[in-house]
C-alpha cells in the first residue's frame, strides 16, 4: 500500500535538533508521499486543538501524560553536570568554599525538583536560563556548571562531565497523540 498525506509532529527543540532529524530523514525516504512537518514547542496541549498529530515530550520519570492523550515511552534521558576543563581548573566544585557556580534552570533555580538530590546543591547559581541551547552556550563560555541531557552535551568537544558526577535518568521521552486518533486511517 502506498501512503500519502501530512503528519504534524511537535517536540522540544532539544529532541528535534539532536534526536529526531535522522528519523525524519529516513521516514521521508521511505514514505516520499507523506509530508512531515515538525513544530517546535514544549506544550503538551498542542494536541488539544488538532494542531498536530503526534507530540514527543520530555516528562519527569514516573509522570503520566494527561488522560485525554494516549502514548508510550520511547526513550529515557540521562542527564549529567558539564563544564569546560578550564572552568573546572579554576573553580573546583569539591573544595570547601568553592567559587564554582551552577547555571540554573529557568525561574526555579535550585528549587527545581531536579536539584533535590544533586551532588552540587551546595553551589550558588550564577545565572538562570530556561533553554538547553542557552545553557550549553553558557557552559561553553565558562560561565559555570550546567545540568544537561547527555545526548546533547556528550557531543560537545569543549565540555566535559564534572568529575564525581554520574549520569542519572530523570526524564522519559513520550510519544503522545489524542485518544480519538488511534483509529485514524492514512489515505
Predicted ranges, named:
Residues 49, 63-173:
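C-terminal regulatory
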Residues 12, 84, 184:
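Residue-level signal for threonine
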Residues 4-66:
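Central regulatory/effector-binding core of bacterial HTH transcription factors
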Residues 8-10, 55, 103, 146, ...:
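Short, well-ordered beta-strand segments
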Residues 13, 152, 179-180:
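Short loop or secondary-structure boundary microenvironments that flank
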Amino acid at each position: 500500500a502506498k501512503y500519502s498525506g501530512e503528519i504534524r509532529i511537535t517536540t522540544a527543540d532539544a529532541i528535534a535538533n539532536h534526536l529526531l532529524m535522522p528519523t525524519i530523514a529516513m521516514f521521508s525516504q521511505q514514505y516520499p508521499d507523506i509530508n512531515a512537518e515538525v513544530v517546535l514547542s514544549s506544550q503538551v496541549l498542542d494536541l488539544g486543538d488538532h494542531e498536530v498529530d503526534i507530540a514527543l515530550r520530555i516528562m519527569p520519570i514516573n509522570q503520566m501524560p494527561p488522560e485525554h492523550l494516549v502514548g508510550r515511552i520511547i526513550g529515557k534521558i540521562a542527564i549529567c553536570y558539564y563544564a569546560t576543563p578550564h572552568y573546572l581548573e579554576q573553580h573546583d566544585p569539591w573544595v570547601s568554599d568553592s567559587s564554582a557556580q551552577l547555571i540554573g534552570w529557568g525561574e526555579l533555580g535550585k528549587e527545581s525538583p531536579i536539584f533535590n538530590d544533586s551532588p552540587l546543591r551546595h553551589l550558588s547559581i550564577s545565572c538562570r536560563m530556561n533553554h538547553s541551547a542557552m545553557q550549553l552556550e553558557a557552559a561553553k563560555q565558562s560561565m559555570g556548571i550546567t545540568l544537561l541531557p547527555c545526548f546533547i552535551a556528550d557531543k560537545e568537544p569543549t565540555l566535559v562531565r564534572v568529575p564525581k558526577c554520574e549520569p542519572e535518568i530523570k526524564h522519559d521521552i513520550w510519544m503522545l497523540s489524542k485518544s480519538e486518533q488511534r483509529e485514524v486511517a492514512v489515505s
